[in-house]
Regions:
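Membrane-embedded alpha-helical bundles that constitute the cytochrome b-like, heme-associated redox core
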Residues: 1-210
């Protein structure tokens, strides 16, 4: 019965052939550190799943944001698990993406013809960093308040554009806008970059280690 179901699924989806083709692709030897790219992608998928769960309970306004987080953590079944998995997953994602970038840079895998792989990877790191910063702000507790204040003051130190950008950040700040950036704008940007990154990897393959 299982084989019949597999045959039925294979005819309609071709998933078996897809898996066989992926397993048959040649991978250069001694590229174990390259696995941090795949680990990062797996963590991104986990962040999506835990984030969708949190969407059902989080309230994006200053008066109820922290209360909704506390309710989810203390009253909802397994809410504490999903929240902590999301919180610690963000830190782990930042670490694995950075490790992947350092490995690629050290092995000079960014060189011709893989410059666009490197550029899209750097942009993905920046997007992940913005995910972490915006995620810290969303509970809107004392840590969120001072994190935003510190980042705004840091932006003000930028030459020429610092003060104008600081004013925009202060004048347009609302928890709801940060929430929309975190759950709509940044995910769209990240998955577009991921798609481009995977297309480039498919086109050029994995770089041979030096």
């Amino acid at each position: 019965m299982i084989s019949q179901f597999y045959d039925w699924l294979e005819v309609r989806t071709g998933v078996g052939e897809f898996v066989r083709n992926k397993k048959a692709q040649a991978v250069p030897a001694n590229v174990y550190f390259y696995c941090f790219g795949g680990i990062s992608f797996f963590i991104i998928l986990m962040q999506v799943l835990t984030g969708v769960f949190m969407l059902f309970f989080y309230t994006a306004n200053p008066q109820e944001a922290l209360q909704s987080i506390e309710y989810m953590s203390n009253e909802v079944s397994f809410g504490w698990l999903f929240r902590n998995a999301h919180r610690w997953g963000s830190t782990l994602l930042l670490a694995t993406v950075l490790t992947h970038m350092v490995t690629v840079f050290y092995r000079k895998a960014y060189r011709n013809p893989r410059e666009f792989n490197w550029i899209s990877g750097v942009l993905q790191f920046l997007v992940v960093f913005l995910f972490v910063v915006s995620g810290i702000i969303l509970p809107w507790d004392w840590r969120a308040y001072w994190s935003y204040a510190i980042w705004v003051d840091y932006v003000a130190t930028w030459p020429i554009i610092g003060e104008p950008v600081k004013n925009v950040l202060l004048d347009t700040f609302t928890i709801y806008r940060i929430f929309m950036i975190h759950v709509v704008i940044l995910p769209i940007i990240l998955f577009l970059l991921l798609y481009f990154h995977f297309v480039m990897i498919k086109k050029h393959g994995i770089s041979e280690p030096l």
